[in-house]
């Protein structure tokens, strides 16, 4: 819950052309323990404030009531206030740069360039993926509680499959993950194995297939 994501729509001549976004790990977002991290939590409500998708800036102005909700739930209100504003500044600067590009080259050229940029990322990943040894690779690792986490990775010329279905059921402790959270880990592994040095984009991860089982530690069921 410490990781707060901010996203901002980017418009050019009234047309939505992109989004800028950032994510930051905040020092404390409430919960039962300082730092909002504890191995004793048995449900997500003990880990801090949960923020749904909610508008914090409207027409360029702060919605202070929303900002106050974040601040008053932190043991470090001044710190989180500054960190959230740093995130706001970052997405604003990103949006400004994209608007400058769209103004210089035109929105249509900008949008085509973004599509080609994503396609370029995919081509680069597939080129490097084809260099990896094809096969099925499996690993089981014992955890502190005695259970085993299992992963099966299948590599072909055009697909990198991560199969996590054979794993323990979700637990009443802070060891579970969402499928999206696991996908981030899979993307990091894939990037480090294929093309670790060049910038990446959404297209870079198109060759990844992630398979998880609902209700397990790697795909927790809603409400737990």
Predicted stretch roles:
Residues 11-98:
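Mobile "lid/hinge" segments at catalytic clefts and subdomain interfaces of large enzymes
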Residues 92, 96-169:
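Accessory "access/gating" subregions that flank catalytic or transport cores
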């Amino acid at each position: 819950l410490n990781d707060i994501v901010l996203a901002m729509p980017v418009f050019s001549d009234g047309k939505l052309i992109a989004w800028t976004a950032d994510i930051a790990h905040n020092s404390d977002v409430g919960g039962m323990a300082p730092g909002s991290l504890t191995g004793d939590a048995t449900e997500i409500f003990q880990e801090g404030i949960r923020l749904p998708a909610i508008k914090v800036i409207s027409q360029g102005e702060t919605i202070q009531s929303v900002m106050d909700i974040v601040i008053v739930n932190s043991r470090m209100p001044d710190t989180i206030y500054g960190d959230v504003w740093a995130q706001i500044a970052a997405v604003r600067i990103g949006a400004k740069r994209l608007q400058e590009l769209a103004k210089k080259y035109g929105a249509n050229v900008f949008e085509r360039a973004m599509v080609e940029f994503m396609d370029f990322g995919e081509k680069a990943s597939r080129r490097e993926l084809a260099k990896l040894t094809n096969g099925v690779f499996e690993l089981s690792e014992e955890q502190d509680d005695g259970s085993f986490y299992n992963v099966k990775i299948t590599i072909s010329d055009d697909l990198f499959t991560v199969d996590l279905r054979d794993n323990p059921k979700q637990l009443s402790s802070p060891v579970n993950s969402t499928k999206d959270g696991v996908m981030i880990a899979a993307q990091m592994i894939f990037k480090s194995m294929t093309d670790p040095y060049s910038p990446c984009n959404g297209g870079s991860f198109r060759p990844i297939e992630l398979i998880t089982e609902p209700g397990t530690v790697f795909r927790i069921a809603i409400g737990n």
